[in-house]
């Protein structure tokens, strides 16, 4: 009985630990549930491609920069955390021959410090170029629905990759509506992106400590 209760406590700890991770499902994968808000006509002009592995751009990415394609896949499957992804970026920076590209990647690495993934990687695509409008910066402004957003999330941002320019950026949303779980952003056509936010380090530590205490109390009670 003592051993059985101890394992029950450990199982509870495992469940709670998974709950501390942003957007992680029961099988360990990260959610890609991101869509263009359907309350306006923008959903007829733009779309979010969730199955990026099926796109021609991703197939090309696997040939030109396989490390990035593999990282996108692993992040979405929940097999790579942000630290692991940052290591991939560090390698890209070391191998970069263009100093501008190298500096941009290093800047992104700095901005990712203390962050965590909220979603897996998806792709933004313009469906109707005739109706689509660019802003002053040459980007498309769109409101997206992100159900995995919570009130507790702080400093929500997007990590973006433009395959055509090989540019990595961390961008701030134009607006965030946590109540309706929507984000307004400005994106490049065909860019890949993931939602990130401040990591819940304290929450994870508290959960671990609570689980350990539960295990100890269960054992002592026996």
Which residues fall in each region the model found?
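Short beta-strand elements of extracellular/lumenal beta-sandwich folds
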Residues: 119-129
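Active/ligand-binding-proximal structured segments within catalytic/core domains
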Residues: 13
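Feature for mature exported/ectodomain regions
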Residues: 2-6, 10, 19-119, 132-150, ...
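Proteolytic-maturation and junctional protease-sensitive modules
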Residues: 132-196, 200
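Residue-level detector of functional hotspots within protein domains
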Residues: 2, 10, 128-130, 171, ...
């Amino acid at each position: 009985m003592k051993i059985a209760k101890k394992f029950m406590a450990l199982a509870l700890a495992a469940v709670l630990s998974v709950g501390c991770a942003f957007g992680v499902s029961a099988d360990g994968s990260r959610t890609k549930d991101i869509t263009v808000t359907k309350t306006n006509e923008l959903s007829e002009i733009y779309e979010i491609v969730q199955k990026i592995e099926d796109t021609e751009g991703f197939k090309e990415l696997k040939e030109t920069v396989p490390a990035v394609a593999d990282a996108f896949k692993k992040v979405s499957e929940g097999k790579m955390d942000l630290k692991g992804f940052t290591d991939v970026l560090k390698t890209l920076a070391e191998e970069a021959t263009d100093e501008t590209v190298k500096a941009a990647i290093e800047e992104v690495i700095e901005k990712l410090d203390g962050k965590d993934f909220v979603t897996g990687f998806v792709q933004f695509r313009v469906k109707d170029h005739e109706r689509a409008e660019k802003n002053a910066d040459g980007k498309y402004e769109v409101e997206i629905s992100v159900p995995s957003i919570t009130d507790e999330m702080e400093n929500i941002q997007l990590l973006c990759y433009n395959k055509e320019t090989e540019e990595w950026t961390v961008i701030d949303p134009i607006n965030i509506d946590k109540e309706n779980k929507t984000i307004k952003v400005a994106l490049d056509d065909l860019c890949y992106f993931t939602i990130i936010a401040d990591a819940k380090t304290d929450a994870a530590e508290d959960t671990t400590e609570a689980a350990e205490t539960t295990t100890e109390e269960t054992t002592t009670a026996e």
